[in-house]
Amino acid sequence: MEPWPLTFLLLLLLLLWLQGCVSGHSNENLYRKVWRREGETLSVQCSYKNRRNLVEAKSWCKVKKKKCDHNFTRSWVRGPSYSLRDDAKVKVVRITMEALRVQDSGRYWCMRNTAGHFYPLVGFQLEVYPALTTERNVPHTHLTNTPMDGFVTTGQVHISDPHAPFTSDVTMFTSEVTMFTSGLLTLASGTTTPTPVTGYSFIDTSGTVTEPERNTESQPATLSPSNARSFSADPVTTSTMSRHQSSSLSTTGTCHPLTPNRSQETYIPAMVVVLTFLPAPVVLVVAYGFWKKRHMGRYNLGSNYAKPWIHLPEGPETPWKPAWSKITQ
């Protein structure tokens, strides 16, 4: 067996495999993706403007086990499972499904009925997510035991530690012993992240700077009279500072930027290019094989071409007689 038929078969199998991959992705593109949450209503439209002015019934079905069920039921809904309205003037079908649940997730088809045969118009892929049961309530911050004669000072605190990649802008409400603080952490890259300071006190220690976790409860920060300092509008330098809480997170690490996720569909154009240009060399190889076999042919010396030459035994030469000798005789 010559090598070029084997190559042709391998390329043919490769083409079939690539065609299967492309057809699989094309089936996904047939459906329009729709996302809803439980309790919401689905309302979609199917257009049939390219159809002639024929009276055709419309239907809405759900794909189950590679079949489209036109009589699917939704037991938790009172009345019909869906409503379908056909506007013949604008040639648009409107389908509505109320009280969605996670069980409604799946693939649906809007079809037309022509003489008992169903033909698809538009496909939809519905994804229903669970409803949000709890909502996050942010409590309001209340200042307790704040005298009326309190004053507000703002300033910028520079941390002397060279490894700390941020500075802290502090806004402080002070009145004798009780005060309230709130600040912003400014990263070295220029990004500001709000970090409310609640539920702990400032203590002078000789450690590193740690950032505590956020506390959902709003409590006023207290400072003992012995450690209370008056902040002026000008920046002041503090040697070391730590924030103590039940669980804390060190901020002396290095920030690594997240790399964006690449799209998973970038290989589709490459596959289309391969399918476009791959058949050309295959056809050229096959055509060259047939042309070579037809025009150049094969040369065979026969079955006796390998036998040695046979030399006949040489006998004594007969004497030469001229032709006129026969006449004289």
Curated annotation (Swiss-Prot):
Residues 25-270 are extracellular. It is found in: Cell membrane. Residues 217-259 have a biased composition (Polar residues). GO terms for biological process: T cell activation. Residues 25-126 form the Ig-like V-type domain. The chain crosses the membrane at residues 271-291. InterPro entries: Ig-like_dom, Ig-like_dom_sf, Ig-like_fold, Ig_sub, Ig_V-set, Immune_rcpt_domain. Residues 1-24 form the signal peptide. Gene3D superfamilies: Immunoglobulins. Induction: Up-regulated in neutrophils and macrophages in response to bacterial lipopolysaccharide (LPS) and inflammatory stimuly. The keyword Protease does not apply. PROSITE patterns: IG_LIKE. Disulfide bonds join C46-C110, C61-C68. Pfam families: V-set. Residues 292-329 are cytoplasmic. Cell surface receptor that may play a role in the innate and adaptive immune response. Acts as a counter-receptor for CD276 and interaction with CD276 on T-cells enhances T-cell activation. PANTHER family: TREM-LIKE TRANSCRIPT 2 PROTEIN (PTHR16423:SF3), TREM-LIKE TRANSCRIPT PROTEIN (PTHR16423). Interacts with CD276 and this interaction enhances T-cell activation. This is Trem-like transcript 2 protein. It comes from Mus musculus (Mouse). The lineage of its organism: Eukaryota, Metazoa, Chordata, Craniata, Vertebrata.
